[in-house]
Curated annotation (Swiss-Prot):
Organism: Caulobacter vibrioides (strain ATCC 19089 / CIP 103742 / CB 15) (Caulobacter crescentus)
PANTHER family: 50S RIBOSOMAL PROTEIN L21, LARGE RIBOSOMAL SUBUNIT PROTEIN BL21M
NCBIfam families per record: L21
Source lineage: Bacteria, Pseudomonadati, Pseudomonadota, Alphaproteobacteria, Caulobacterales
Name the UniProt record assigns to this protein: Large ribosomal subunit protein bL21
UniProt KW keywords: Ribonucleoprotein, Ribosomal protein, RNA-binding, rRNA-binding
Length: 171
């Protein structure tokens, strides 16, 4: 069973067990997410199209993480003027595991398990370092370096002598 849902201004075709990357959703990792705006349901040849949505249809999922997406580069240029500007932008996105598609008296569930292990630990395991290589907490801030010994004060230049006054009329 599959469904076409609308979220974040875009439409997605999903079925139970799919991993879905959508615009940013509010919530912590592991939170349940429900998409109520189901535009179409289908199973084999049987298709139910909503007008505009299918009544009573719900797609449920679990929020796995919220992250930044790929960088989009913005480049502006005015030729022959020496004007060039480069900027970048990374949009927030959420990763959702679809756990069930329900509607029209039917329901399709995903029977797998959801792993919320942080990416740092997964990377350490992939490199063969194991979980022991990953610190359990964020390390404490590094202490400030000891102050340097003060250097000897610089000698001041001797004041300039005033020019000798001459009296007029002396010869």
């Amino acid at each position: 069973m599959y469904a076409v849902i609308k979220t974040g201004g875009k439409q997605y075709r999903v079925q139970a067990g799919d991993l879905l990357v959508v615009e940013k959703l509010e919530g912590e990792p592991g939170a349940a997410v429900a998409f109520g705006e189901v535009l179409m349901l289908g199973e084999g040849e049987a298709v139910t199209v909503g007008a505009p949505t299918v009544d009573g249809a719900v797609v449920s999922g679990t929020l796995l993480e919220t992250r930044k997406g790929e960088k989009v580069k913005i480049f502006k240029k005015i030729r022959r003027q020496g004007y060039r500007r480069t900027r970048g932008h990374r949009q927030f996105e959420s990763v959702v595991r679809v756990t069930s598609v329900a509607g029209a008296g039917k329901e399709a569930k995903w029977e797998g398990t959801i792993d919320l292990t942080p990416k740092v630990i997964l990377d350490a395991r992939a490199r063969g370092l194991g979980d022991a290589a990953v610190p359990a907490t964020i390390p404490a801030p590094v202490e400030a370096a000891p102050a340097k010994a003060e250097a000897a004060p610089k000698k001041k230049a001797a004041p300039k002598k005033a020019a000798a006054k001459t009296e007029e009329g002396e010869a």
